[in-house]
Amino acid sequence: MEFSAKQIAEYIQGIIVGDENATVHTFAKIEEGVPGAISFLSNPKYTHYIYDTQSTIVLVNKDFVPEQEVKATLIKVDNAYESLAKLLTLYEMSKPKKTGIDPLAYVAPTAKLGKDVYIAPFACVGDGAEIGDNTSLHPHATVGSHAKVGNNCTLYPHATIYHDCLVGNHCTLHAGCVIGADGFGFAPSPEGYEKIPQIGIAIIEDNVEIGANTCVDRATMGATIVHKGVKLDNLIQIAHNVEVGSHTVMASQVGIAGSTKVGEWCMFGGQVGLAGHIKIGDKVGIGAQAGVPGNVKSNEQILGTPAIDAKNFMKSSAVYKKLPEIYTTLNAMQKEIEELKKQLNK
């Protein structure tokens, strides 16, 4: 498909600087631009590429002022990255979508399927399970008995939803992610550890995206809940009875222990670890590899292990870098003091 700068600008409410009739048919990074491609510039580190890019159209923020001639047609918008997302979404929606049940898929006789669903080869839908309209199950995706998946969802290969668990509308579950596996519950006894049956469920609300090989365990009792708009990267562990607030985002390898409650609009860097049975407030930012042993109030920014206020951590880090120099200075001072003591005692 081909679109003109004028059509694109109207769709994203942008202002054209250049040829409104310039046309594009593909996307490209600004540093890899080719004729007929549309690119974007939002990070100042990439500004120098705009003067040499071969892309036909470039999305830029409204405050961008070129320092030299730009050959590409510019479309100025409030947020270039956000506008790119809208265009990419439109592009994805324009792709043909498969529907129907492949002969090699298994759908239980008691399962309920919505309109225009796609069940790929070797996908499985269990007894009493429900699949909403326009939802796609890719090869080997599994929806367990009496589980429910909403409308406009995509389950990529080997995504698994265990029995009785609930997934809302407009959700994306990437390859290998698991919703509703047993929580890590074992009771110690003289003979070892006895398994505690996990009789709860996991609930994934609307507009959630879950990365590859991420696990959201079912609750011991009640529900593990991932609220609306949450975005989880690959390789994340959400333990039993955890609750993740709306629109929170987490980078890869985050681990959250059981029964911890995370607020709304939080941002966690990679490899953050949260202890169990704690509460994290709203709009909390936690830097990569931080270990959080206790409650965190709303709007705090923390770093380190154990995690502390981010500004204090940075100050401590600056001192830490100087420890060898400080040690040398202290050692020299100690020797001077010992010499002074000897002289005073003569």
Swiss-Prot record:
UniProt similarity note: Belongs to the transferase hexapeptide repeat family. LpxD subfamily.
Catalytic reactions on record: a UDP-3-O-[(3R)-3-hydroxyacyl]-alpha-D-glucosamine + a (3R)-hydroxyacyl-[ACP] = a UDP-2-N,3-O-bis[(3R)-3-hydroxyacyl]-alpha-D-glucosamine + holo-[ACP] + H(+)
Keyword hit for DNA repair: no
Keyword Ribosomal protein: no
Keyword annotations from UniProtKB, A to Z: Acyltransferase, Lipid A biosynthesis, Lipid biosynthesis, Lipid metabolism, Repeat, Transferase
Name of this chain's protein: UDP-3-O-acylglucosamine N-acyltransferase
HAMAP family: LpxD
Pfam families for this protein: Hexapep (PF00132), LpxD (PF04613)
Subunit structure: Homotrimer.
Higher taxonomy: Bacteria, Pseudomonadati, Bacteroidota, Bacteroidia, Bacteroidales
GO molecular function: N-acyltransferase activity
The encoding gene: lpxD
Functional description taken from the UniProt entry: Catalyzes the N-acylation of UDP-3-O-acylglucosamine using 3-hydroxyacyl-ACP as the acyl donor. Is involved in the biosynthesis of lipid A, a phosphorylated glycolipid that anchors the lipopolysaccharide to the outer membrane of the cell.
EC id: 2.3.1.191
NCBIfam families linked to this entry: lipid_A_lpxD, PRK00892.1
Pathway: Bacterial outer membrane biogenesis; LPS lipid A biosynthesis
UniProt GO cellular component terms: membrane
InterPro entries linked: Hexapep, LpxD, Trimer_LpxA-like_sf, UDP_GlcNAc_AcTrfase_non-rep
Gene Ontology BP annotations: lipid A biosynthetic process
Active site: H240 (proton acceptor)
Leader sequence segment: none
